[in-house]
Regions:
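Conserved strand-to-loop turn within each blade of WD40 beta-propeller repeats
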Residues: 43-46, 113-116, 154-158, 198-201, ...
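WD40-repeat beta-propellers
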Residues: 49-53, 119-122, 161-165, 204-208, ...
């Protein structure tokens, strides 16, 4: 079966929800917990971080009776809520919105960025904050580990990209941005490692393993809100606030080459998050101002939409790519099972 055949078989099934945050869910990361079970961690505008105990294979159903005043004629009088996990531990320390999270490869260390201008390094097994990083002069928006996890990258509203060691010491600062540093993505292509950095000035800078800027994708009129890449490190997916998605060659040096831009997609809706997964070939997920969308790269309309919970701000897959997690502005996290019927 060809890739073209497989990609048309992808779909999502709603599994259930996670409830525990008192504010919008802004960031999601998923690693591997005990016995190989997915370890989901979320950050929120309620200033907290939650480690979740997932019960994906043993959901709990609740029947919620609706207030008679809220029921329109002919509508159901009750709804079924399916819970697929519960908060295992809440991590507190930030005194403003938690804006971004990054988890290391063995799921033992977490870094969090906050609008309180700080970064925290957490030990996941003990759920304790190990280090407080201070240095940004304004809200911190984005965070990422370097490929070897010896350094931490952070970007903020002070238009700076900072490099830290795990002791909380600033090793280098890049002030070449003309707008907020909104998103950071670690990319590996063969033996080469890159850091892609998006800004509200509309530009994306590609940094090499020496952390010097190797290439800049020029800025446009609209802010870059999210970045994603394929597993092989060939293509970079850039989401802009106005709803444009660009698919670019990561290693092309000449940003003006026509061949550099593989695809430009106009979705017509504000984008908060983008997530591409190579397993599903031409399929990518979008968190938008209205909800969740699943799209094909060459498709003009969404293949799947969920607009029940308002804006979708965060997206992640579990390690097996069996589940998609989406964080919403109403504080809920929805869980979807990926169905790839073309797989044998």
């Amino acid at each position: 079966m060809s890739k073209e055949d497989v990609k048309d078989k992808f779909s999502l099934e709603k599994v259930g929800i996670l409830e525990g945050h008192g504010g919008a869910v802004t960031s999601l990361v998923c690693g591997e917990g005990e016995n190989g079970a997915p370890l989901l961690i979320s950050g929120s505008r309620d200033k907290s971080i939650i480690k979740w105990k997932l019960t994906l294979y043993n959901p709990k159903e609740e029947i919620i009776k609706l207030d008679e005043e809220d029921i329109e004629e002919g509508q159901p009088t009750e709804i079924k809520k399916v819970l697929v996990g519960q908060p295992l531990k809440s991590l507190h320390g930030h005194n403003h919105f938690v804006s971004s999270l990054a988890l290391n490869s063995d799921s033992t260390k977490l870094v969090s960025a906050s609008w309180d201008k700080t970064i925290r390094l957490w030990d996941i097994p003990s759920s304790k904050s190990e280090k407080l990083f201070k240095g940004h002069t304004k809200d911190v928006l984005s965070i990422a580990f370097s490929h070897d996890e010896r350094l931490i990258f952070s970007g903020g509203m002070d238009n700076s990209l900072k490099y830290w060691n795990t002791k909380g010491e600033t090793k280098y600062e890049n002030n070449q941005f003309r707008g907020w540093v909104s998103c950071i993505l670690n990319i590996t292509k063969g033996k080469n490692n890159y850091i892609a950095v998006g800004s509200w000035d509309g530009s994306v800078k590609i940094l090499g393993s020496d952390f010097n800027v190797q290439r800049e994708i020029p800025g446009g009129e609209y802010a870059v809100t999210s970045l994603s890449a394929d597993d092989a490190g060939d293509y970079l997916f850039i989401a802009y606030k106005n709803g444009t998605v660009k698919v670019m060659n990561i290693e092309d040096k000449d940003s003006e080459k026509e061949s550099d831009v593989k695809q430009v997609i106009e979705t017509g809706i504000d984008i908060n998050a983008i997530l591409f997964e190579s397993k599903f070939f031409q399929i990518y997920a979008l968190g938008t101002s209205k909800g969740l969308q699943i799209r094909k790269i060459k498709g003009k309309k969404p293949e799947f939409e969920d607009n029940e919970n308002g804006a979708c701000l965060a997206l992640t897959y579990d390690k097996s790519k069996e589940y998609l997690f989406a964080g919403f502005a109403d504080g809920t996290i929805k869980v979807y099972k990926t169905v790839n019927e073309g797989e044998s």
